[in-house]
């Protein structure tokens, strides 16, 4: 599977994204927050989502490279909307994990014509005690500009201990990545998650939605996914035995997503 890293201008910056597949339909994936971003993982991401490649042209977005202090999830959704407009994409199927799921919620509220169907995984529509504690810890750790510490506190919450042990070599390498400048950016992302609250506007989301969550989510709590689905009146699937990043841990995750898109046609 060949994956290409491309970019589209948004304001004065270049918004990078990973593209693969040659299908007639558009799938837009919005990644969760991370210290180093996802562009170096293009081939691995394309391999993981290979089942979508025949039916879809897949584009995977992170965030703009430069994020000023005070950048909000709504701002990030506006950046994504600008990128999709520039690419001529509308009525796409969307998949967002964690903060990516928050961005998709806001996009579906502000630019509903861009979204045909949405899968929101391990996300939330408003703060809760678990998310407040998590994002405060991540923000404050990142403000110390110590990438090893940021990786440690984030990996421990995102993945189960078993998954980290099974992928010990990969995590050992990843734990040493990042720069002090990327820590500052991570702090902005964490604060945007900490204060995100779109509950007053959720009724504006009219597209079909599948919420996927996991009991025992140490970042946002499983209850956050159940609450989001209840407010939207949509389908929800809750996993057990996996971590916050269930999209990486659950073997049937991607097939479940694809099946939902098919049901929405």
What positions do the PLM features span?
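Conserved acidic catalytic loop of the alpha/beta-hydrolase fold
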Residues: 75-92
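Conserved alpha/beta-hydrolase catalytic His-Asp/Glu region
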Residues: 129-132, 148-201
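Flexible "cap/lid" loop of the alpha/beta hydrolase fold
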Residues: 105, 109, 116-145
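Conserved alpha/beta-hydrolase "acid-adjacent" motif
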Residues: 218-224
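Catalytic histidine-centered segment of alpha/beta-hydrolase-like enzymes
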Residues: 242-254
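Conserved HGGG/HGGXW glycine-rich cap/lid loop of the alpha/beta-hydrolase fold
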Residues: 9-67
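Short beta-strand/loop motif that positions the catalytic acidic residue
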Residues: 205, 211-213
